[in-house]
């Protein structure tokens, strides 16, 4: 009884090593890094409770999609700039095959066509204070745009109502940035159309994030299709009051999730279910099935199969 187990353990170890050499994983070919910012606890204007929930939900979704996620909440101006700088450093160190994604939920403003993300400590007394106290969206875009990456994705749920109505020059919503005028490989999604306001929502998440959390986890959807479906879902849930908008200069394909499941790309079938079909599995099938499996799961698959001819 001992020899088949030892033989199969050797097979599992050998196939794992062979698989790593001959069939590179998607994780090895494409690093995924994300920065998620949720701004709820504003100090001088009413809070946005859903922004924190939005960030929490997106952190979970992106983690399941294979991203290494950095989550930051309720950032003052200096902290937000530092978070962006630190994230850019991680992206730079990760290399040119990296997909970098930034999700921002919170207030956003535009002044003279320039967009600003709003730190929780922003307290302008006049319009001229906003460029000094805010964080320019273009600074974020340019910082990541200067780095060699496979793709840069920005999701901006930042077009909520103007938190400073006394400043008449602070425009409603955000101005659309044309990605085609900047670095290639950039995709920007706005939670609503140019100059319009986005709703915070009456549920635990905003309408935009609610749609994103549902649609983005569907398997095998190209990013363009994902955000088209998000647009349709948000328009329906808000009776047409809010229409998400995108600008893209992507030159490569991207899917949040591959495969046939709505879970993580790493959430492959377990050893027990894989073993059910092992009687007709070829060596090439073994290589594919063992791809990316932890050693103990691969071992269980092999000993469950327990076919002596599998080493012939």
Regions found by a protein language model. Give the residues of each.
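Cysteine endopeptidase catalytic domains of the caspase/legumain-like
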Residues: 2-311
